[in-house]
Amino acid sequence: MTSRRMLRACTHPTIAVMLVLMGLIPTVGSAAAVPPRSPVAGPVPVSYLDLNRYLGTWNQLAAVPQYFNLVCARDTQATYARDPQGNIAVHNSCITWANTVNEIDGTAVVNDRQTGAQLHVSFPSVPTQEGVEGPTNYIVTALGPDYSWAIVTDPTRVTGFVLARAARLDADGWQQVRAEIAAAGQNACLYLTSPTTGGETRILPLCLL
């Protein structure tokens, strides 16, 4: 529900190589080399998400690279608001490498009424993702006690986003975030920092920050 499903994916060869090295794109023969794995339990959501406190604008400070966010050069944001149907209106935006604004609107529906932290996010303009109702693809696995930051992934842990109200986190904040990423069963080295105006300007693995 952040820069997720951003349009016009980047296909630069160096990015493709980076994704191969990070294990996000399988290489020839990799399927035969890796033995089948036992089923792994999905990420655990936070015990309770106060949606009213979660509404508003979030800055993406780091993310696991995906085709839909490679178009973004800096200042990736997600803004959430209640819609007339009682769901959550999603507005994602970023500044592209061409210094233009890339944006998309969608809807989030709460699937887990007990915690409020598992949702289905849809985007009408994206093929196969038009349906407002659907399986969970957005799980809030960690929150700052004051809702100053959040970590989001999906049931397969393929995606990952570090969101914050401010454009930057201090060293203690990043330490907490890395610990929570590990607790969710993910590797902080697969997250790359997302440049923000007034915050981190480099793109580097979160484990090296």
Q: Which residue stretches match the model-derived regions?
A:
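A beta-rich soluble binding module of mature secreted/lumenal proteins
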Residues: 2-209
